[in-house]
Amino acid sequence: MAKQSMKAREAKRAKLVAKFAEKRASLKAIISDVNVSEEDRWNAVLKLQTLPRDSSASRQRNRCNQTGRPHGYLRKFGLSRIKVREACMKGEIPGLRKASW
């Protein structure tokens, strides 16, 4: 189990990403637009730097919904490999079974 503080930190990051997503996207569009003047592009870079660091989507970490484990995360299920295996063995995930060949 991950610490509660780590789960809370990730939840806070998710809120910040959602809050600033539109603003970040518009600033990045200005920065990458070659038709905008150099001064305006530089001002957009400076504004982007003033946004909170945790508002960047790349700062988020996928975590298991049950345990908060950061490694071995399977996107399809939203769980870690350990919890997917446990659920699979109990028959809780329809259509998923242990491989045999």
Swiss-Prot record:
InterPro entries: Ribosomal_uS14 (IPR001209), Ribosomal_uS14_bac/plastid (IPR023036), Ribosomal_uS14_CS (IPR018271)
Keywords (A to Z) from UniProt: Ribonucleoprotein, Ribosomal protein, RNA-binding, rRNA-binding
Role according to the record: Binds 16S rRNA, required for the assembly of 30S particles and may also be responsible for determining the conformation of the 16S rRNA at the A site.
GO cellular component, one term: small ribosomal subunit
Gene3D superfamilies linked: 1.10.287.1480
The keyword Disulfide bond appears for this protein: no
SUPFAM superfamilies, sorted: Glucocorticoid receptor-like (DNA-binding domain) (SSF57716)
GO molecular function: rRNA binding; structural constituent of ribosome
Protein name: Small ribosomal subunit protein uS14
Subunit and partners: Part of the 30S ribosomal subunit. Contacts proteins S3 and S10.
Any Gene Ontology biological process: translation
Stated family: Belongs to the universal ribosomal protein uS14 family.
